[in-house]
Amino acid sequence: MSFVVIIPARYASTRLPGKPLVDINGKPMIVHVLERARESGAERIIVATDHEDVARAVEAAGGEVCMTRADHQSGTERLAEVVEKCAFSDDTVIVNVQGDEPMIPATIIRQVADNLAQRQVGMATLAVPIHNAEEAFNPNAVKVVLDAEGYALYFSRATIPWDRDRFAKGLETVGDNFLRHLGIYGYRAGFIRRYVTWQPSPLEHIEMLEQLRVLWYGEKIHVAVAHEVPGTGVDTPEDLERVRAEMR
């Protein structure tokens, strides 16, 4: 099954300026992500960036670059620009791999592509079980609840589902009903084209989660439990030091 990986790599970052180019053990972070994507068996890998320095680093590593505008409001909008520039057919399977995930396992890149290809749905993603209270109550860990067929009912920064009886006794432990969403998505190119025609939803603005736009407009997102748990992503200088140590 063929699929394309697109890696959005926006240069500007409030907490970590020039994030795609930060050095991790002798290589720019974006090159580590590119290498993980190559291991997935993708037919084509494209780094979508708004900065010439990022483009040069990717091309020096033998990667393909698509220059995009700097004013996109979301990663999906950046994907849509690449879809149009590359003239992908509507049924092309595209996996969006975040440019700040240098430890992402290649197996889950392939997994999300396979899951999408096996279903008549426009979008698929992954999640992992939550086993500790700290993560369950952390608003930076996005939770997802599913229906009986594995489709998302809702994504939230809140603790969902709320375990009424357990939490009435205390908030120290959690059961087996919590899933943390992973920021990796598979789409069909035609779905991306439709997504960017929709107005942002109120829920999307409240939670600051762009995938809620899909549910708002009545579309389905399939969610599978990831075969592997990805390593730390890089959002802050502290994350960067942790990743450097783990990848040493």
Swiss-Prot record:
InterPro entries: Cytidylyl_trans (IPR003329), KdsB (IPR004528), Nucleotide-diphossugar_trans (IPR029044)
NCBIfam families: kdsB, PRK05450.1-3, PRK05450.1-5, PRK13368.1
One GO cellular component term noted in the UniProt record for this chain: cytosol
Listed name of the protein: 3-deoxy-manno-octulosonate cytidylyltransferase
Alphabetical GO biological process terms: CMP-keto-3-deoxy-D-manno-octulosonic acid biosynthetic process; lipopolysaccharide biosynthetic process
Listed GO MF terms: 3-deoxy-manno-octulosonate cytidylyltransferase activity
Source taxonomy: Bacteria, Pseudomonadati, Pseudomonadota, Gammaproteobacteria, Enterobacterales
Known catalytic reactions: 3-deoxy-alpha-D-manno-oct-2-ulosonate + CTP = CMP-3-deoxy-beta-D-manno-octulosonate + diphosphate
Family matches, as HAMAP family: KdsB
Location(s) in or outside the cell: Cytoplasm
Pathway listed: Nucleotide-sugar biosynthesis; CMP-3-deoxy-D-manno-octulosonate biosynthesis; CMP-3-deoxy-D-manno-octulosonate from 3-deoxy-D-manno-octulosonate and CTP: step 1/1; Bacterial outer membrane biogenesis; lipopolysaccharide biosynthesis
Family per record: Belongs to the KdsB family.
Highest taxon of the lineage: Bacteria
Keywords, sorted A to Z: Cytoplasm, Lipopolysaccharide biosynthesis, Magnesium, Nucleotidyltransferase, Transferase
Function field: Activates KDO (a required 8-carbon sugar) for incorporation into bacterial lipopolysaccharide in Gram-negative bacteria.
Cofactor: Mg(2+)
Documented EC number(s): 2.7.7.38
Record carries keyword Nucleotidyltransferase: yes
